UniProtKB/Swiss-Prot annotation:
InterPro entries registered for this protein in UniProt: EF-G-like_DII (IPR053905), EFG2 (IPR030851), EFG_II (IPR041095), EFG_III (IPR009022), EFG_III/V (IPR035647), EFG_V-like (IPR000640), G_TR_CS (IPR031157), P-loop_NTPase (IPR027417)
Gene for this chain: mef2
Gene3D superfamilies with a match to the protein in the record: 3.30.70.240, Elongation Factor G (Translational Gtpase), domain 3 (3.30.70.870), P-loop containing nucleotide triphosphate hydrolases (3.40.50.300), Translation factors (2.40.30.10)
Keyword Protein biosynthesis: yes
Source organism per UniProt: Schizosaccharomyces pombe (strain 972 / ATCC 24843)
Cited CDD domains: EF-G (cd01886), EFG_III (cd16262), mtEFG2_II_like (cd04092)
Principal cellular location given in the protein's record: mitochondrion
Cellular localisation: Mitochondrion
Protein name: Ribosome-releasing factor 2, mitochondrial
Gene Ontology cellular component list: mitochondrial matrix; mitochondrion
Residue range of the transit peptide in the UniProt record, numbered on this chain: 1-20
Family membership noted in the UniProt record: Belongs to the TRAFAC class translation factor GTPase superfamily. Classic translation factor GTPase family. EF-G/EF-2 subfamily.
Length: 813
């Protein structure tokens, strides 16, 4: 007999204000959904909204009525482009949920969203295992110490395997202890085996969902809880033993208790639950659950896992707090001075600029004067909102631990920190410590954009500025000589979507040119130049700019002016605008005006250096992947103009570049963007695909593996050793008749996976090529590289590698 265990709450949009009323910070979960494209992120999110009582029906990606994917481009393409935030309740707890894109072109959306999360749900397609973009988003979350739970989705699909997915987690992700908390349960039919539910390893029960044709029962709220049947007892005991043994590996106390009786069933559920939560938050383990969001099976348990295992803002703060931080500070986050972080800026048709903010400490109240430590400017918070995807509700305040929106402010950008105006004198305290920077990746594609007429140009420029403010990974430049406008982005789709939004949302009248690859230049020798500029008072500003190759870690000139600690601090942050800038040092008893702070001087020098690197000597491409610093030798009065610093550093940088080129043209190299490529194809096509990649496109093949087998890479070989001691659930046949299968992975032939790194210029339109080579029997995916050739120095996610001389002669004859 079926009975309702979970029932949707009857909360609807008119009562939004309930979400603001007296919810303890300990009852909040700030969680992101991260995954590869098409893993089921938005579908899972829409089901959560239904079970949380936010919606009265399931939003569907295919029919274009989802709450979270609300942009026209998202509904047209059926993919997530913008990260969307929404709040709903589950078990009397508030979940602030962010659904992020899975397409490689929109990886910056994930980066800035992850920066404000306390936890993440990583979705993995059970029929495909860990995919290319899964690795990228996993590393983004791991880099920031975000606790995670894994949801193995699509367990209803043919070819889905929890065991193979766990294997791929071991071999592809930095996840030594995935805790299998659930096993899939299928029907016993010979011809067709349906996915019915799960074995709950922790709660020691079987949970089945109604999969009949009864529409009243298939919304996922009708379930049956049963004792573990004898037919599944062996699987259950094996999984239970593995769960306890994994926890013993990370908890000595539990290990000692286990050695007394060696009985995994002797531990209470509460005892294991507390350890799982503690070790999940610390990052030692990752709970693994399974289900099918499309079929409404086992969605509620993942919502329970968000509440049970992922941290509240207080718990996440405590995890990252230094040992010197007192417990009083941790407990009273909402009583501390304001500290908030901006992670997104958009332009609303009627409300203007909307700034998304996560309040880490204190309370952001309407009318409060906010101070920006970066710009040293203040603005008043006129209106505040709770956010529900594309809809908002005005509120009086945004409390600690919550996510909200500020409207109308102009002095704050993505990544900025907000503090009280009253605390502005101590802003350096807020910029130090654990405030991580949101990295803006270098664009890899470029296209011209032309206004239809001269009168359309001002509106186009304004739209481009707004788009850049909203999405810093989208950039634009205008040639000072011929006025040509160029837009830059993370890929073809990124530029196409950005252009569509410029036209449809911002009202720009313009045409888009052909998308091309954006190249860069770099230097391989040290260069130096000194510039002397005179003020109106005939005072001389003497500035010396040094440019050092990115590969030169041990440059003696750098070590002469900076300590090892200063050097490592800059390198740990990575490049910004393609430069590792170490700052400036005074020389020869340098005296500067009292009103100029060290930071303001450094900012203006940096702006000048970046401007000086905007055009390289080979083909006019921007210079990147280099290190720089400068020294100042001056005796200046208090009326010294700050702009002179920018002018001098820009001139010295240009002189350093072109004087080196004049002496040694071979000291410069062209860089081109590379992409990580994953091609899944039947074994018979591996030879022809590999030949095309290497012979025609200059690719480097990293590995060729069989789907479901262990990878051959170094990291995977390490994981293979681990697998000998780790639990892998036995495979269960999945639901659909094999002869009805049409996808690639359902083929009866051996499926191989080719992983390679390829110049982007060679694969701009590779989908049609790979389809022709394999007669439509291949799956082609691209992602931005996560590892660079100089990992100690190059910015996270750098895609640019030196171009071979052979390719350089062909492309630039």
């Amino acid at each position: 007999m079926l009975r309702i265990v979970w029932k949707p709450l009857k909360i609807r949009l008119p009562v939004w204000r309930r979400y603001q009323s007296n919810i303890s910070i300990n009852s909040i979960r700030n969680v992101g959904i991260i995954a590869h494209i098409d893993a089921g992120k938005t579908t899972l999110t829409e089901k959560m909204l239904y079970y949380g009582g936010f919606t009265s029906h399931f939003g569907n990606v295919d029919t274009g009525d989802t709450v979270m994917d609300y942009l026209p481009a998202e509904r047209q393409r059926g993919i997530t482009i913008n990260s969307a935030a929404i709040s709903f309740t589950w078990r009397n707890q508030r979940i602030n949920l962010i659904d992020t894109p899975g397409h490689a072109d929109f990886t910056f959306e994930v980066e800035r969203s992850v920066a404000v999360l306390d936890g993440a749900v990583a979705i993995i397609d059970g029929s495909a295992g860990v995919e290319a973009q899964t690795k990228v988003v996993w590393k983004q979350a791991t880099k920031r110490g975000i606790p995670k739970v894994i949801f193995v989705n699509k367990m209803d699909r043919v070819g889905s395997s929890l065991g193979s997915t766990i294997r791929s987690i071991y071999t592809n992700l930095d996840c030594p202890y995935p805790l299998v908390l659930q096993l899939p349960v299928y029907s016993d039919g010979l011809q067709e085996r349906k996915f019915l539910g799960i074995l709950d390893i922790l709660q020691q029960k079987m949970i089945l969902w109604d999969t009949s044709d009864n529409k009243l029962g298939t919304d996922g709220t009708h379930v049956q809880e049963l004792p573990i049947p004898e037919s599944h007892m062996e699987r259950f005991i094996e999984a239970r033993n593995a769960l306890v043994m994994s926890l013993c590996d990370v908890d000595e106390t539990l290990c000692d208790e286990y050695l007394e009786n060696e009985d995994s069933l002797a531990f209470t559920n509460d005892r294991l639950f507390k350890i799982i939560k503690q070790k999940t938050i610390s990052g030692n383990v990752v709970p693994v659950l399974c289900g099918s969001s499309l079929k409404n099976i086992a969605v509620q348990p993942i919502m329970d896992a968000i509440i049970d295992y992922l941290p509240s803002p207080v718990e996440f703060y405590e995890k990252n707090a230094s040992k010197e931080t007192s417990s009083d500070k941790i407990i009273s986050l909402d009583k501390r001075p304001l500290l908030a972080k901006i992670f997104k800026v958009i332009h609303h048709a009627s409300r203007g600029i909307l700034t998304y903010v996560r309040v880490n400490e204190g309370t952001l109240s309407r009318g409060m004067m906010m101070f920006n430590p970066r710009t040293k400017k203040s603005e008043r918070a006129i209106r505040l909102y709770n956010v529900f995807a594309d809809q908002t509700q005005e509120v009086d305040c945004i409390s600690a631990g919550n996510i909200g929106v500020i409207s109308g402010i102009k002095q704050f950008h993505t990544g900025d920190i907000i503090i009280n105006k009253e605390n502005s004198k101590n802003f350096h305290e807020y910029l130090s410590g654990n405030q991580s920077v949101i990295s803006i990746p270098e664009p890899v594609c470029i296209a011209s954009i032309e206004p239809y007429s001269l009168k359309d140009e001002p509106a186009l420029l304004e739209a481009l500025a707004n788009m850049n403010r909203e999405d810093p990974s989208f950039r634009y430049t205008q040639d000072l000589e011929n006025g040509q406008l160029l837009i830059q982005g993370m890929g073809i789709m990124h530029l196409q979507v950005s252009y569509e939004r410029l036209v449809s949302e911002f009202g720009a009248r313009a045409s888009l040119g052909k998308v091309q690859v954006g190249y860069r230049e770099t230097l391989i020798d040290v260069s130096f130049n000194s510039v002397t500029l005179s003020t109106e008072n005939k005072e001389n500003l003497i500035i010396n700019v040094y440019l050092i190759p990115i590969s030169d870690e041990g440059d003696e000139t750098l070590k002469k002016y900076f300590s090892e600690g200063e050097i490592q601090k800059v390198r740990s942050k990575g490049q910004e605008d393609g430069v590792l800038f170490y700052g400036w040092k005074p020389e020869n008893s340098c005296t500067l005006p009292d009103h100029l702070s060290f930071q303001r001087i450094q900012e203006n020098i940096y702006f000048g250096i970046v401007a000086g690197l905007s055009h390289g000597p080979l083909h006019g491409f921007p210079l990147t992947n280099l290190q720089s610093f400068c020294t100042i030798s001056s005796f200046l009065s208090n009326d010294f103009p700050l702009s002179l610093l920018t002018q001098a550093s820009m001139k010295a940088t240009k002189n350093a570049v072109f004087s080196l080129y004049k002496r040694s043209p071979k000291s410069f190299r062209i860089l081109e963007p590379y992409m990580d490529v994953t091609i899944t194809t039947p074994e018979e096509y591996v030879g022809i695909v590999s030949k095309d990649l290497v012979g025609k496109r200059g690719a480097t093949i990293k590995e060729i593996t069989e789907i479901g087998k262990n990878a051959a890479s170094k990291d995977s070989q390490i994981a293979i050793g681990i697998l000998g001691e780790r639990y892998l659930p036995a495979d269960e046949p999945s639901s659909v008749k094999a002869n009805n299968a049409s996808s690639l992975l359902q083929s009866s032939s051996v499926i191989k996976c080719i992983r390679a790194q390829v110049p982007l210029e060679q694969i701009l339109d590779y989908n049609s090529v790979i389809s022709s080579l394999t007669k439509g029997n291949a799956k082609f995916l691209m992602s931005h590289p996560m590892e660079s050739q100089t990992p100690k120095l190059v910015n996270y996610g750098s895609s640019f590698h030196p171009m071979s001389m052979q390719r350089q002669k062909r492309i630039f004859p």
